[in-house]
Amino acid sequence: MDCTWRILFLVAAATGTHAQVQLVQSGAEVKKPGASVKVSCKVSGYTLTELSMHWVRQAPGKGLEWMGGFDPEDGETIYAQKFQGRVTMTEDTSTDTAYMELSSLRSEDTAVYYCAT
């Protein structure tokens, strides 16, 4: 029996403040500790450049935890201190898709990951 810890990533779209925005995320992932995962969030109804995309997660039995997002005032992506060095958030404006990549995965990274605007 394989007793290796596996990390489950579930992704779901959070309702944004823009009434017509739809966010469609990639599906669930199972990863081993030490690996990395990249999840996507496709925007429709608006273009990605019109929005400020953020990523949050919710571990089992825990509250929502903000991971980072785009700061339109600075024009930069900012990350929560806890995730700096492990998370990268990017955007492909040609496809209106945002990405969040988390590396060096740990068992405590098991969570539902949300994109939100």
Curated annotation (Swiss-Prot):
Residues 116-117 are annotated as: Complementarity-determining-3. Its main location: secreted. Residues 70-77 are annotated as: Complementarity-determining-2. It comes from the Eukaryota. Residues 20-117 form the Ig-like domain. Keywords: Adaptive immunity, Cell membrane, Disulfide bond, Immunity, Immunoglobulin, Immunoglobulin domain, Membrane, Secreted, Signal. Residues 1-19 form the signal peptide. InterPro entries: Ig-like_dom, Ig-like_dom_sf, Ig-like_fold, Ig_V-set, IgHV. One of its GO terms (cellular component) is immunoglobulin complex. Immunoglobulins are composed of two identical heavy chains and two identical light chains; disulfide-linked. PANTHER family: IMMUNOGLOBULIN HEAVY CHAIN. This is Immunoglobulin heavy variable 1-24. It comes from Homo sapiens (Human). The gene is IGHV1-24.
